[in-house]
Curated annotation (Swiss-Prot):
This is Alkanal monooxygenase alpha chain. The keyword Repressor does not apply. Keywords: Flavoprotein, FMN, Luminescence, Monooxygenase, Oxidoreductase, Photoprotein. Changing residue 101 to S: In strain: UM4102. Light-emitting reaction in luminous bacteria. InterPro entries: Luciferase-like_sf, Luciferase_bac/NFP. The keyword Cell membrane does not apply. Its EC number is 1.14.14.3. The synthesis of this protein is regulated by a complex control mechanism that has been termed autoinduction. In fully induced cells luciferase comprises up to 5% of the soluble protein. Strain ATCC 14547 is luminescent. It is an enzyme of class 1 (oxidoreductase). It catalyses: a long-chain fatty aldehyde + FMNH2 + O2 = a long-chain fatty acid + hnu + FMN + H2O + 2 H(+).
Length: 103
């Protein structure tokens, strides 16, 4: 993702942390990434795609549980990405993964 999108994600993270009473200057932070290392770069990419597909499918299932509300603010960013994706005429998870790579 580009610098503007990274900043937007960090701003959202900070906003949610502050809303829950955390001092964002004095807490430990952790980032996680889906990665793979392989001599065959296509195989490494395919492995990551499988995990990313599972993550997106889990997101779809989770959003069926929650209604839009302030309590699901963390989902709003991803819901917005899904809306943009669907408005572009895409519907399947593999195409959503391709869209993520384009970002």
């Amino acid at each position: 993702i580009n610098t503007h999108e990274k900043k937007a994600q960090l701003d959202l993270y900070n906003e949610i942390a502050l809303e829950h009473g955390h001092d964002i200057q004095n807490i430990d932070h952790c980032l996680s990434y889906i990665t793979s290392v392989d001599h065959d770069s296509q195989r490494a990419k395919d492995i990551c795609r499988q995990f990313l597909a599972h993550w997106y499918d889990s997101y779809v299932n989770a959003t069926r549980i929650f209604d839009d509300s302030d309590q699901t603010k963390g989902y709003d960013f991803n819901k917005g990405q899904w809306r943009d994706f669907v408005l572009k005429g895409h519907r399947d998870t593999n195409r959503r993964i391709d869209y993520s790579y384009e970002i």
